[in-house]
Amino acid sequence: MSRRRTQKKRIVMPDPVYDSRLVELLVRQLMREGKKSLAYRICYESMNRVADATQQDPLVIVEQAIRNATPLVEVKARRIGGSTYQVPLEVASERGTALAIRWILSVCRKKTGRPMAAKLTAELLDAAKNSGLAVRKRDEIHKMADANKAFAKYRF
């Protein structure tokens, strides 16, 4: 076991426009090379496009998209007696949210040919409808955890 003290959780202040911690987490994951103002611009432009496309509050759509992409279980490799098992574990709510945001943004970054705001808009709308690549990734993780349910006894 580690002898260090456990690190305190950092408090995430809400973003200035929507007053939402979730949007701030999205912006922080979106940021590259310390360019936070660019990340804000991309995020807010994407949310404006979501509002135009759905005629609804974009914050509700973003929350729905992240909720649909959030995994409930994940698998972790555990080495026992010379063989490695994929052990299914429940995901804490903060980690689940972080994974969902990360998956949505990684799907956006893999696509090419359009501005990031357009790609983020498309993926958020897809995830809100319970489709899209981020939701498919969550389903794959759930299937893998279900297939390895027998190894749940080796939980950490």
UniProtKB/Swiss-Prot annotation:
Keyword line: Chloroplast, Plastid, Ribonucleoprotein, Ribosomal protein, RNA-binding, rRNA-binding
MF annotations from Gene Ontology: rRNA binding; structural constituent of ribosome
Any Gene Ontology biological process: translation
Chief location of this protein within or outside the cell: plastid
Any GO CC annotation of this UniProt entry: small ribosomal subunit
Subunit structure: Part of the 30S ribosomal subunit.
CDD domains: uS7_Chloroplast
Signal sequence range: none
Name the record gives this protein: Small ribosomal subunit protein uS7c
